[in-house]
């Protein structure tokens, strides 16, 4: 028998054994219970260190490596929300393909030998469009989101039941041999419950009862729910949860969201949370009896298409997480936390079974000590002083504790880790640009829309309508158009002066066109959504067209009665006429939903849309309302790819019909003269999102993640819709190179 045949048989035999072992393991049922100390999975108490990875914020081709990188980082569980509006885009019509293949994602977690924490919600917040709730539900009569009313409860229970039954069918809950060990109903409702009165309390209790009745065989949680009933576990979200205690003494201490960074908005600066402070918060939590901890986010990913919420949340949801948006470890954060996890797990049994005592060792100094009957001992030494390093005596040995740090001593003698002493390597990140290339020479196809109504108006009203109630979020865009007649006797025509256009809007953004010429843009921001525009306008004698393109930039995703938050214009007037101010608010307005190219689906591969495209090697610059199409080759190498849009204004991008998302390299500005950006972050002291900000005067998002799996080997169709004007010749594909230093 030749060598090739022998090796083939051996390989096949090994594969059969591996498949058998995995199959045996995957069907091994494990009951999940809990007491005040921890979860018990099967017959073993376990500490859980979980990594949040939202399946629709990456692509299926990335899921295995993301899960594996989390496992290599010392995590033993993956957590995700379930995204209702992605799964039920219309009533009773479900979708589980592509990025929304939740079953495939959970099975990848299972194949990695990890646990799964599933937060079904189905309200999720998450800086996700409309908090994950389908927009259509707002228009079901009698519906108030997250409140005690029949329509909301009917659809919430219906979706929850559908998801639970799907996962039961796939045997994904732990008692069935699956990886799911915990589930969550609702999300941070405690913040808002009082705003709904007694009905809020009834709804919270109903939510818990409805969830428990699903009989999934694993515990249910409610985060930030201080009146959670005995049947569910109340849990903590925040930057620090060491002082948290569940609302009844029989429940374990669970931290559902530790924020290792923060989200970003278009026009906002870059928030940073140092690795030392993240590690400090985790060590304090486990030192104080915590047993389940989840990083929100461990990999933030990307808000592809129109999925970002806020409004104004960027397409990037990087979150400065341990795994970056592109799927690469962020060093030193990933490495430092890996070292922390290893140190914590050295004392796993003591932390969940041993006797806990707390000792004061001096001003702002304390020790949390765990022992068992055999004399085994572990200690967490904390320096709570946010300015001064300190020497501390513990069991006749001196230890040096930097300010705001925790040392872990798994044997009460040897310091194996200190949260402020970073030994992990760091990384240098570069975005290496490549010009767009085509196998047959780069040729652009260009189609420019005319401002205002195309075809027939959708409707006409003598008032300004709410943007969201009109579009129902089927598009970002809504045209408000009207016209005025200017007498040749107006003084401003004779003097050569300009009247002033005044516009007020509830948000989010507006492009103004006068007589088909782009006049300018006005916008809100992530901290103040409404805005006003005041701009001189050139009018002529006779008829003048006023075309206003209102845009949403993601819908509100949280807050009491947030579904009632509107957008769009509330008043329009022009000052400077002979008779004073011309109020156009109640004039005759014609409306059109969306832009023409959307309706024609020009973003679909090979779709000409029955419009006349101009073919050119030099596409026009600074031209608003323009569609650009170009066929390109994939960039060289295998590194992750970002689309560099620094030369463009604002719009949407697609590759081979896949939605890259909104682009807007809006400059990050200070909110007030007192706001500052920093060069270095001081980890010491309590973290808040505005504590350590960088990026003043820089684009809030320059690069837009394009997953490698979206590229074909050749002939890739890149489509850009530019709203206000840019230079497409300078668009580049940049490869993300990370070097360890």
Swiss-Prot record:
Transmembrane segments: none annotated. Keywords: Apoplast, Glycoprotein, Glycosidase, Hydrolase, Secreted, Signal. Residues 1-29 form the signal peptide. It holds the Pfam family Glyco_hydro_35. The active site is at residues 188, 257. InterPro entries: BetaGal_gal-bd, Galactose-bd-like_sf, GHD, Gly_Hdrlase_35_cat, Glyco_hydro_35_CS, Glycoside_Hdrlase_35, Glycoside_hydrolase_SF. Glycans are attached at residues 31, 358, 396, 469, 525, 583. It is found in: Secreted, Extracellular space, Apoplast. Ubiquitous. GO terms for cellular component: apoplast; plastid. One of its GO terms (molecular function) is beta-galactosidase activity. Its main location: secreted. Belongs to the glycosyl hydrolase 35 family. This is Beta-galactosidase 10.
């Amino acid at each position: 028998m030749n060598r090739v045949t022998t090796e083939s048989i051996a390989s096949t035999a090994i594969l059969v054994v591996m498949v058998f072992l995995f199959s045996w393991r995957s069907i091994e049922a494990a009951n999940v219970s809990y007491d005040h100390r921890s979860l018990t999975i099967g017959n073993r108490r376990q500490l859980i260190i979980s990594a949040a990875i939202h399946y629709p914020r990456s692509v299926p081709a990335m899921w295995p490596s993301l899960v594996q990188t989390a496992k290599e980082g010392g995590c033993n569980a993956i957590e995700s929300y379930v995204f209702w509006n992605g799964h039920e885009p219309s009533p009773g019509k479900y979708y589980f393909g592509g990025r929304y293949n939740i079953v495939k994602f959970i099975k990848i977690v299972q194949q990695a030998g990890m646990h799964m924490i599933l937060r079904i919600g189905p309200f999720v917040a998450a800086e996700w469009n409309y908090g994950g709730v389908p927009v259509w539900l707002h228009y079901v009569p009698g519906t108030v989101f997250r409140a005690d009313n029949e329509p909301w409860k009917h659809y919430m229970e219906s979706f929850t039941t559908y998801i639970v039954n799907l996962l039961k069918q796939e045997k994904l809950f732990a008692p069935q041999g699956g990886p799911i060990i915990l589930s969550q109903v609702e999300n941070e409702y405690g913040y808002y419950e009082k705003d709904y009165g007694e009905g809020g309390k009834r709804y919270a209790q109903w939510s818990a009862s409805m969830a428990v009745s699903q009989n999934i065989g694993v515990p249910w949680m409610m985060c930030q729910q201080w009146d959670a009933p005995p049947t569910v576990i109340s849990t903590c979200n925040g930057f620090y949860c060491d002082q948290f205690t569940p609302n009844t003494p029989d429940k374990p201490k669970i931290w559902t969201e530790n924020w290792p960074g923060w989200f970003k908005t278009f026009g906002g600066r870059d928030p940073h949370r140092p690795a030392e402070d993240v590690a400090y918060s985790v060590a304090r939590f486990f030192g104080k009896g915590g047993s389940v901890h989840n990083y929100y986010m461990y990999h933030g990913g990307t808000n592809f298409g129109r999925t970002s919420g806020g409004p104004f949340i960027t397409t990037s949801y990087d979150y400065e997480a341990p795994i970056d948006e592109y799927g690469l470890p962020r060093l030193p954060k990933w490495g430092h936390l890996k070292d922390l996890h290893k140190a914590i797990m050295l004392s796993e049994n003591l932390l969940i079974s041993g006797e806990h005592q707390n000792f004061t060792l001096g001003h702002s100094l304390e020790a949390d000590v765990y022992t068992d009957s055999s004399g085994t001992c572990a200690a967490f030494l904390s320096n709570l002083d946010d300015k001064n390093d300190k020497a501390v005596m513990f069991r006749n040995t001196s230890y040096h504790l930097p300010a705001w740090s925790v040392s872990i001593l798994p044997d009460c003698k040897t310091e194996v880790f200190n949260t402020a002493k970073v030994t992990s390597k760091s990384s240098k990140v570069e975005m290496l640009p490549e010009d767009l290339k085509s196998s047959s020479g780069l040729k652009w196809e260009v189609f420019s829309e005319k401002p205002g109504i195309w075809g027939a108006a959708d409707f006409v009203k003598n008032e300004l309508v709410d943007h969201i109630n009109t579009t129902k979020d089927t598009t970002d865009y809504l045209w408000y158009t009207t016209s005025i007649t200017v007498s040749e006797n107006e003084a401003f025509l004779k003097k050569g002066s300009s009247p002033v256009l005044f516009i007020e809007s509830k948000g989010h953004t507006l492009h103004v066109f006068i007589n088909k010429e782009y006049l300018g843009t006005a916008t809100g921001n992530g901290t103040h959504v409404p805005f006003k525009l005041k701009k001189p306008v050139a009018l002529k004698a006779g008829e003048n067209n006023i075309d206003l393109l209102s845009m949403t930039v993601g819908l509100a995703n949280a807050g009491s009665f947030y579904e009632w938050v509107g957008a769009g214009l509330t008043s329009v007037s022009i000052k400077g006429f002979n008779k004073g101010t011309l109020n156009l608010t109640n004039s005759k307005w014609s409306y059109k939903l969306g832009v023409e190219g959307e309706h024609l689906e020009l973003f679909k591969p090979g779709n000409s849309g029955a419009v006349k495209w101009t073919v050119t090697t030099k596409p026009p610059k600074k031209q608003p309302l323009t569609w650009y199409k170009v066929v390109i080759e994939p960039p060289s190498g295998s590194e992750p790819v970002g689309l560099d849009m620094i030369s463009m204004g604002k719009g949407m991008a697609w590759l081979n019909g896949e939605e890259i998302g909104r682009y807007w390299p809006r400059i990050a500005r200070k909110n007030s003269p007192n706001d500052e950006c920093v060069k270095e972050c001081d980890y010491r002291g309590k973290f808040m999102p505005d504590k350590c900000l960088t990026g003043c005067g820089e684009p809030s998002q320059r690069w837009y993640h394009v997953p490698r799996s979206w590229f074909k080997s050749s002939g890739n169709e890149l489509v850009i819709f530019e709203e206000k004007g840019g230079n497409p010749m300078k668009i580049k594909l940049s490869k993300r190179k990370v070097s360890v230093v």
